[in-house]
Amino acid sequence: DVAKALGNPSKAKTIVFSMKVFDLAHLILKDEYLNFPEDIPIPVDYHVRNVAISSGIVDKYAGDDDVRRAWMSVLSEVNSRISRRVNLLRIDSVVWQVGKVMYKNNFAIRSLIFICLL
């Protein structure tokens, strides 16, 4: 509905991010995440894109849809290994933080290794 009202595709970063903010507000008020479908797209931004490339889940940047598909594959693997189902908004939260630290440290591999050890 938000996407239609704004005339944007539902996978647009602004639309997905607004859903994420709504989800976080709901978490603060109700102490639980909203039940979004697993196929909700990840909001692709600079950090999410660069972690996808740096991690090797995409060979090279050919568009945001490739990045979304790669993170969807990661989500499928995560959900096959844990007892609880998560969606890409949960993965985005972690990926974005990793990407931010990588950027602050000029993508130094030592910074990424340090984060992974935390």
Give short role names for the model-derived ranges.
Residues D1-L118:
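C-terminal accessory module of base-excision DNA glycosylases/AP lyases that mediates lesion recognition
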